[in-house]
Amino acid sequence: TQTDNVTPLDDGTYDNCTIAVTDNINNTSDNLPVSSFTIGAVKPILLQVTAVPNPTNNNTPNYTFFSTLPGTINYGGSCDSNNTSAVGEDNNTTITFNTLNEGYYDNCTVSVTSNTVPSDNLSVNSFTIDTTAPSLNQVTPVPTSDNDSTPNYTFYSNQAGEIIYGGNCDSSDTSADADNNTITFNALADATYSDCYITVRDNASNTSDNLTVNTFTIDTTGPVLDNVTNVPTPTSDNTSSYSFNSNETGAITYGGSCESTYSAAV
């Protein structure tokens, strides 16, 4: 390994350097290309290290950059900060922007002045500040009594995001649009459900208030009937009575040759 750092280089980017070795009997190696590099020994050279998250719900976000030299930080565009010193000398500098309003930022810059020599502007990545949580409203409730164990529910969200479920209900539908959204609950056992709710978390991690799903009952089991009093036989009564027991209320359906004006089981 041969290290040569004796010959000073001017500031700039070097992308055409090569090295070759000639041995004692004048055999010369192929050229070894040196990877491109930049010198910032007089004029600071800046590089982005950690971008501002995009989007973010933090209105005082951090930004990290590297400077080849220490100096005074200068800000441009719509961003500013109380952090005014860049450490340089192979260390990263993290700045915290002053409070930003909600919105889209694409013109922020930083530069460093070292010994009166300013760097070029380093453009901060574009980012959006979003501190407003989604707002949800019920559109179509679950039927209060339903024999569908995978019922639908429709709600409105004013922002897109991830749907999060709570209580005894869940669903494979996990993405909400900024519109009406119809979800299908995963299979539910026969029971009454009164603790189900949904929330939506937007792309900036703002989470809505819980939207409570209306109380509903899943009932997929048909009524069970038992004979109580048979029609007497033989009988001379052509409007004979018949008694039965049902474990559920409902509408009576007649079949065969018999009919009645009684239409409801109690």
Region roles according to the model:
Residues 1-11, 16-20, 31-32, 72-123, ...:
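Extracellular beta-sheet repeat scaffolds used for adhesion and glycan interaction
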Residues 5, 36-38, 64-66, 96-98, ...:
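Generic structural detector for well-ordered beta-strands
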Residues 8-9, 55-56, 67, 100, ...:
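Hydrophobic beta-strand core residues of beta-sandwich domains
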Residues 26, 30-44, 124-134, 213-226:
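Flexible, low-complexity linkers/stalks enriched in Thr/Pro that connect modular domains
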Residues 45-58, 137-148, 224-237:
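Short, solvent-exposed loop/edge segments of extracellular or virion-exposed proteins
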Residues 59-63, 149-153, 238-242:
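Structural beta-strand segments of beta-rich domains
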Residues 65-73, 155-162, 245-252:
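Short proline/glycine-enriched turn/loop motifs at strand-loop junctions of beta-rich domains
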